[in-house]
């Protein structure tokens, strides 16, 4: 059975630059508004999908809309995305041996650069449907709190 880990990196992850000039990736996301908020879809927010397109690693939406993104922002975002993926791979590995990684979900397009300790990275057909499958098979949990007055008894 493969080990599965969900990562907060997706196509709608917001890209920013902090006060020190450091590029940030997430944790906030445009979520399901990706197709209206991302630059490549005519929006005004820089997302990780825009970085993929600006890097020439994906052809989604209007490529011309990301030509003005500064190269240092693109490179910084790619480095940060790679750091996030690298950390996840290292956290999941049980030995130093190289592994094969299977990426699914909307954020799987974020894989752009080689990862240390990974011999092969697979992004299967229909990879973006994994989010729907995950939501469909998720276990639902809940908690009920009942209070009972010891003097008067249960009052439901």
Predicted regions and their residues:
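Helical "lid/coupling" subdomains associated with nucleotide-phosphate turnover
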Residues: 1-156
């Amino acid at each position: 059975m493969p080990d599965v880990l969900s990562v907060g990196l997706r196509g709608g992850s917001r890209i920013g630059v902090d006060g020190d000039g450091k590029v940030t990736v997430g944790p906030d996301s445009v979520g399901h508004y990706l197709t209206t908020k991302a630059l490549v879809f005519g929006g005004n927010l820089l997302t990780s999908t825009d970085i993929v397109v600006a890097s020439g690693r994906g052809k989604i939406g209007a490529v011309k809309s990301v030509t003005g993104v500064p190269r240092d922002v693109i490179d910084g975002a790619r480095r940060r995305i790679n750091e996030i993926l690298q950390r996840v791979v290292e956290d999941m590995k049980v030995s130093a041996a190289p592994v094969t990684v299977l990426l699914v979900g909307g954020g799987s397009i974020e894989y752009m650069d080689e990862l240390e300790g990974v011999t092969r990275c697979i992004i299967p057909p229909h990879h973006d449907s994994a989010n729907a499958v995950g939501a469909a098979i998720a276990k639902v949990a809940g908690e009920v709190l009942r209070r009972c007055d010891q003097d008067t008894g249960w009052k439901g």
